[in-house]
């Protein structure tokens, strides 16, 4: 089973993350931020992976360290779970609607970290989650997993719907990119490495 287990302890956060790429969509998420937990569960469910997030952060300050550091640990766990990347499809793209919202996520497990985040939020908060932190979370995941990640909101006005569509689409794109394909010998690159 392709799994990644990361423990990250700083003066601001204590985090344990486990990701199993070949799962069924089971997730336990406890970050202390209800809406963020909900998004992690959706990501896992729609990515058909199993995950565990146990996070204690300095929420008395704000949610920044908790959300960003969870993204760092999650990215490292995904990187670890991918191992040598042999026979993976490498690319994944998903369009996900959520009522009036429509989001595109396209990614490459290239080990060339990059984030293009094309989204605007009309509200500063959804529940206890600062909407500015959505971009910071995805940046942390992309740079620590080695993902070229594009996220584009094609339509939407409700911040909850937009963010939910992002996390679902990211899960589906990761699932697509991490699938094993027996036709691929080694890694999917003319360079012979990713």
Swiss-Prot record:
<dbReference type="Pfam" id="PF00475">
    <property type="entry name" value="IGPD"/>
</dbReference>
<dbReference type="InterPro" id="IPR000807">
    <property type="entry name" value="ImidazoleglycerolP_deHydtase"/>
</dbReference>
<keyword id="KW-0456">Lyase</keyword>
<comment type="similarity">
    <text>Belongs to the imidazoleglycerol-phosphate dehydratase family.</text>
</comment>
<comment type="pathway">
    <text>Amino-acid biosynthesis; L-histidine biosynthesis; L-histidine from 5-phospho-alpha-D-ribose 1-diphosphate: step 6/9.</text>
</comment>
<dbReference type="GO" id="GO:0005737">
    <property type="term" value="C:cytoplasm"/>
</dbReference>
<dbReference type="InterPro" id="IPR038494">
    <property type="entry name" value="IGPD_sf"/>
</dbReference>
<dbReference type="InterPro" id="IPR020568">
    <property type="entry name" value="Ribosomal_Su5_D2-typ_SF"/>
</dbReference>
<dbReference type="GO" id="GO:0004424">
    <property type="term" value="F:imidazoleglycerol-phosphate dehydratase activity"/>
</dbReference>
<keyword id="KW-0028">Amino-acid biosynthesis</keyword>
<dbReference type="InterPro" id="IPR020565">
    <property type="entry name" value="ImidazoleglycerP_deHydtase_CS"/>
</dbReference>
<protein>
    <recommendedName>
        <fullName>Imidazoleglycerol-phosphate dehydratase</fullName>
        <ecNumber>4.2.1.19</ecNumber>
    </recommendedName>
</protein>
<keyword id="KW-0368">Histidine biosynthesis</keyword>
<keyword id="KW-0963">Cytoplasm</keyword>
<dbReference type="GO" id="GO:0000105">
    <property type="term" value="P:L-histidine biosynthetic process"/>
</dbReference>
């Amino acid at each position: 089973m392709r799994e990644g287990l990361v423990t990250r302890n700083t003066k601001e956060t204590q985090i344990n993350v486990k990701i199993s790429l070949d799962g069924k969509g089971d997730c336990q998420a406890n970050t202390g931020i209800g809406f963020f937990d909900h998004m992690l569960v959706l990501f896992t469910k729609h990515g058909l992976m199993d995950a565990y997030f146990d996070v204690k952060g300095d929420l008395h300050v704000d949610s920044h360290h908790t959300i960003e550091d969870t993204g760092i640990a999650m990215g490292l766990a995904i990187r670890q779970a991918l191992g040598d990347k042999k026979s993976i499809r490498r690319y994944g793209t998903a369009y996900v609607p959520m009522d009036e919202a429509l989001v595109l996520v396209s990614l490459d497990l290239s080990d060339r970290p990059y984030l293009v985040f094309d989204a605007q939020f009309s509200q500063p908060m959804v529940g206890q989650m600062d909407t500015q932190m959505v971009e910071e979370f995805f940046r942390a995941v992309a740079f620590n997993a080695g993902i070229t990640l594009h996220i584009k909101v094609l339509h939407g006005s409700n911040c909850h719907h937009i963010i939910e569509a992002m996390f679902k689409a990211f899960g589906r794109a990761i699932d697509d990119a991490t699938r094993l394909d027996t036709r691929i010998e080694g890694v999917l690159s003319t360079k012979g490495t990713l």
